Structure formats: structure tokens, C-alpha cells
Amino acid sequence: MKKKSVIAITVAILLLTLTFAGSCLYVRLTGRGNGVTTVWGSDVEALSDAICKGCKNEREKVYAIYDWVTLNITYDYEFDTEYQYFDIDRTLSTRKGICFDFSNLFCALCRSQNISCYVVDGYDRTDREKLHTWNRVFFDGIWCNLDTSFDAVRKAEGKSLYGFIQLEKYDSQDKEYVITRIY
């Protein structure tokens, strides 16, 4: 009798644990990943191939990807950053996103072409509450800063762009933002 009670209690505890800890279970992602949070599938690789079709070198590929992202994704002013998560499929299906979405999409498209690219998180040097995400990409033997979300907004408004800013190395400090993470 005592043995049956112990088994019943153990099973009950196990079932409760599994019920309430479902989000803690290990889930194998089925995409291709090459960074801390940037994960993508074969559909993103196919899109990257289509964008870069006819490009002869890395520079042309980077600029083609940059142009595609800044012309086809719009800034989502209604996105609730309190519950931010990144999902390339959501960004592509809605054609909207915030800086985090723009940067991770650009990174996935570049990495699909075997182009070294990082996502950079940071905050404004004058306001720690003003968070931002942008990219660093390597082509033609140099690292460059670029900001696809900023440039998408500026293109839509017909204003001058941030563009590509040459860096000494991938982890060079930024003039406007304090870097908190590069991945």
C-alpha cells in the first residue's frame, strides 16, 4: 500500500511539473542558425538567393540585401517592445518590424550568402532608456556599420541615409551608442 502511494505521488508530481514547465522543455529548432538569436529556414535562404541573383561579388550582394530590406520592410510604430521577440517569418509575412527585426533579417539574409554579419545591441549615449539594434557586415576586407531600420524610415521620408560607415574592426566602439552585445 505504501509503495502504491509513493508511486502515485511521484506520478502526480511529474505530471504537474510537465504541465507547468512546458516552456522549459528543450525544443530543437528546425531552421539554420548562425548566431545567438538569428535562426532561419530554407525559405529565407531561397529569398536571399533570389535577392542576390546576378550579383558578382560580396559588395553587390550586401548592397542588394540592404536595398531589399530597406525598400520592402517598413518600421512598425505600433509594435509593443515590452513583449519583443524576433521571428523572421513574422517580419517577412507582415513586411513590418522594429530595429531588432530589421537587423536580424538583414543578418540572416547575409549569412545565407556566407557573408560575415553581426547584430549589435546598444543604447544611446545620452539616454540609457533609448535602446537600438543595428548591423555590422564584412565585405571587401572591411567591417561596416549599417542601420537598415533607420535607413528604411529615411528612404520613405526622402531624407539622407545613415549608409555604410567603415570600422577598424567588428567590435569597434560606436560614436552614438554604447554597445551591450554583438552576436
Place the predicted regions along the sequence by residue.
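N-terminal Sec-pathway targeting helices
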Residues: 1-23
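Secondary-structure boundary elements
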Residues: 31-93, 138-144, 174-183
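Active-site nucleophilic cysteine motif
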Residues: 61-65, 95-110
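Hydrophobic alpha-helical segments and their boundary regions
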Residues: 10-12, 86, 130
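Hydrophobic/aromatic-rich core segments of domains that either
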Residues: 53, 67, 104-172, 183
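Sec-dependent signal peptide cleavage junction
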Residues: 20-35
